[in-house]
Structure formats: C-alpha cells, structure tokens
C-alpha cells in the first residue's frame, strides 16, 4: 500500500510565504492524487493568513499548465518496511541534496538501484533479499546507520564495521580512478561530526573520504558482490550536516543513485531534483541566493526545453547548465 494524498498547512509560515508554497509544490511534484489545504477555516477566516489563499490559488493555476505533461515520478527505490525505525528523516535530507527517491514498504526486488537506511535493517529477511538483488546485478546503497543496526550480519557482504569512534572533519577528497586512490582537497561548508567506519584496504574501494591527521575516514565505500555491488554512505551524526559535504562528495553520492535516472545534479545541497518517466525533470532551489548548477543528462539528450518559459537550452558534453533562482522551478523536457 501507499499514501496517495498529501496535505499542508500555513502555520509557522508567516515569516515567508514561499515556505508555505513550497509545501504545495512538493505535494504536487510528487503527483499526489489528492491535496488537502489544512485548515480551511484558518486560511479563510484568520487575518493572520489572509494572503495565503490567493497565492496558493495562483500556484495551482501555474502548475495546471504543465503538471499533466510530467508523467509519473521516478527515483531510486528507497525501502523501509512498515515497522522499520531508524534514520527516520534521512530520505528528506537526501532529497534536499538533489537525489530523487521512490519510497517502498515492500522490498523492491525488481529494481536495479535500491536504497536501505537504518530502518530497513528491521526486516528479518533483509540479508537474503540483498543477496538476491546483487547476485542478479543490482546496486544496493546502505547508510552507516544500516551497517550499525545490522551488526555482524553485514559481514556477509563486505568487511566494514561501524566503530564507536567519531571524527570531526572539514576537508574531503574523492577518487578519480574508481577507488584505487583518493585525491584532491575540498573544504566543506563547516566541520561535520561523522562515525568512523572500519574497513580493510583492498577488500573495498573508497570513493570519497574525509581527511584527518595523517589519515582519512571513508565517506563513500563500494564493493562488488556477485554481478552487482554494495555502497556505504557515511551519515553525519546530525543528518542535516549532509548539506555541508562539498560539491565533489555530493556528486559521488548522487552518482550512486543516478545510474537509472534521466539526469543527475551537480551542485551544492539545497537544490532539489524531481525526475519523471516522461523524460521531464524539475530543478528547484531552496538556497537563499542564486546558484549555477549542472545536470548530467542521459546519453543522447541534445537539449532541454524550459516548458514554462518556452526556452531551449543546449546540452554540451552531456551536461546542461542551469541558473537557479531561490524558490523558482525550472521545468524541463529533455529532448533527444
């Protein structure tokens, strides 16, 4: 089963009307079949919220112009069993890093990319389900919290353990040779506290890391298993600190999720990406300033059409440059 509706309210949004409208956009972009404005009495009768009804009405008029063209949302399958608990908001934080996810309460055995946060470890059959996916060529992405909760059961896949030690980090590196070595030094927005994941060199590949003193700590690890692979993302103790990973590290993380997607975002956190099976995408910035970003698009895409502004944007070298404005949606049709 799944929830096919959505609702939002105006409370605590008077400081910025955009914060109210964003709730509406997110509900509609997820293609909820029913939208409830809560509470209608407040919106109509309470002078505090007198501006909310006209602006949300204008929003509905705007979205009516293109919502029917978008098709169905697509994203990496994010499995969380009905009674699973742990890292409860991680999907929201990853979404704010520009990673489209499609939530599932049943294990998505037919999907090629599967995301498992800590709550997925509450499925007593999760190890056998993961094995089947990877033996059939699938990519499974897990969090450090999933590794911690699964405990010794995770050793079935790779020799990685969640240690009791922490590290405060602010400088990072990525790998340009699929994990053979790391290179570069990229400074995060601010220091981030992460768990130290223990792993054996040459048993697993480090795709992104954080620098310590004469050492480094893994941020993204990957290992082959059967015809597939498993990747591990280190989640900061404060999940919101994912936003403070530098662009280069975020690009590594997005790449894990994006191999089945029509486009992958390259840019800072705070930029959302919505993907659809029709070949449309929406890019929306929640940053408080303008920002230039890039979409890495699927092979064969030669241009994008902004269907709101009726502007064509050429693709060069598989990349589409975009100028984002706070709270403004770029609704794009990717054209081959």
Regions found by a protein language model. Name each.
Residues 1-100, 209, 232-234, 240-243:
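Hydrophobic targeting/anchoring helices
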Residues 27, 76, 114, 283, ...:
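Hydrophobic, well-ordered secondary-structure elements that form the walls
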Residues 33, 111-114:
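Conserved acidic residues
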Residues 43-44, 109-111, 149-150:
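Short secondary-structure capping/turn micro-motifs that flank functional sites
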Residues 91, 101, 105-107, 117-336:
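A conserved amphipathic helix/loop scaffold
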